[in-house]
Design a protein with these regions (language model features):
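Non-catalytic structural scaffold of enzyme domains
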Residues: 1-274
């Protein structure tokens, strides 16, 4: 039997998933959270999908072994490439999985007026077709325009400065989306909410942006409540952080993403069995 006092576990390739945790701390402040940033493998966006699936299975195993009542894939590439393997591991522990793709697709399909939805994501996410399938499953004959933006997540993860070069890069990625006349854009990478103001300026005020954080926090709340695992009461929850790469660089960027003090970040190392 899973105990409601256990934490919600989430992972991402880096710090992007903290945009999801940020929304969870607002919507569900009484819950405990464990967050793992797999920074030694960042970025996931260009990696071999077979290698990624093995990695995701291992991360799911490690997090659930520690004890968790829910597993959140706070990474679009990991969801697109490895949701199935994460679910297989979680099933052995009797734990449910909340991914990041489907909740966003549902919101985008519900709010579009002209049926033209853009997706800005990593190369792996676009090539997986995960968003296209999730949007087609909404059954509304939507027109989906996907654009791979491979340089954007590394740029954000490194904490680079926003300058003219960045704007030019973003304009290049947004050009086909503008041309297609989308009215809704899915930010298909949990790093991208940090550049939402820039994207909004380029696309214009009539394009609605759908980020993962809000959609996933709502899905987590629904899942916990329906399974009777939501934490009762008003106590302030705890959060702890693990990084597979250097903790100092993780801490600096992560504090900016979360807008909260991180406390100690612990480094974990594990290798995928060949």
């Amino acid at each position: 039997v899973i105990d409601a006092s256990l934490p919600v576990a989430m992972f991402d390739s880096g710090v992007g998933g903290l945009t999801v945790l940020h929304e969870c701390l607002v919507a569900l402040p009484q819950e405990d959270y464990v967050y793992l940033g797999d920074t030694s493998m960042f970025p996931y966006g260009e990696r071999d999908p077979v290698e990624l699936r093995r990695r995701i299975a291992l991360i799911a195993e490690k997090l659930l072994e520690r004890g968790a009542k829910l597993l959140v894939i706070a990474c679009n590439t990991a969801t697109a490439i490895g949701e199935e393997v994460a679910r297989e591991v979680a099933a052995r522990y009797g734990v449910e999985v909340v991914p990041v793709v489907a909740p966003q697709a549902e919101i985008a399909a519900a709010i579009t007026d002209n049926g033209r939805i853009g997706v800005l994501a990593t190369t792996n996410t676009v090539e997986s077709g995960a968003y296209r399938r999730a949007l087609e499953a909404q059954g509304r004959g939507l027109d989906v325009i996907e654009v791979a933006a491979p340089r954007l997540a590394p740029f954000i993860q490194e904490g680079s400065l926003f300058d003219e070069e960045t704007m030019a890069m973003a304009r290049g990625y947004c050009a086909p989306l503008r041309e297609a006349g989308i009215d809704t854009l899915i930010l298909g990478c949990t790093h991208f909410p940090l550049v939402a103001p820039m994207l909004q300026r380029i696309l214009g005020r009539n394009v609605r942006l759908v980020s993962g954080g809000h959609a996933v926090a709502a899905a987590i709340q629904r899942t916990l409540e329906s399974s009777g695992l939501a934490r009762e009461g008003d106590d302030e929850g705890t959060y702890e952080f693990f990084s597979t790469g250097p903790v100092s660089s993780f801490g600096e960027v992560a504090t900016r993403f979360l807008q909260m003090p991180l406390g100690e970040v612990r480094q974990v190392e594990f290798t995928v069995p060949a």
